[in-house]
C-alpha cells in the first residue's frame, strides 16, 4: 500500500511540475503555434528518466518505493503523452498539418535522443 501512495504522491508533484514548467516554457517561447511547453517537459522528463532509470538499474541507487515515486509517479506525470497527442490533433484539426507533423517528429526524435543522452551521462559519470 505504501508503494501505491508514493506513486500517487510522486504523480501529484510531477503534475504540478508539468503545469508550472510547461506554462513557463510556453510563455518564454512566445509561441502559440507550436506547443513548446509540452515539448520541453517531455524532453526534460526523457532526459531525467534516462539518467535515473539507468542509475537505478546499473547501480541500484533506488529502492522499489523510490523508483515508484520518482520514475512512475513524478516523471510519469511530468511527461505528457496524452497532452502531446491532444495538441497534435488540434494542430491537424486546425489545418496546421506541417506544424502537427513537426510536433510529432520533434517529440519523438528529441525525447528518444534525450533518453539516450541521459543514459550515456549516467553511465559515463557514475561508473
What are these regions (language model features)?
Residues 1-127:
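Membrane-interface helix-loop junctions in multi-pass transporters/channels
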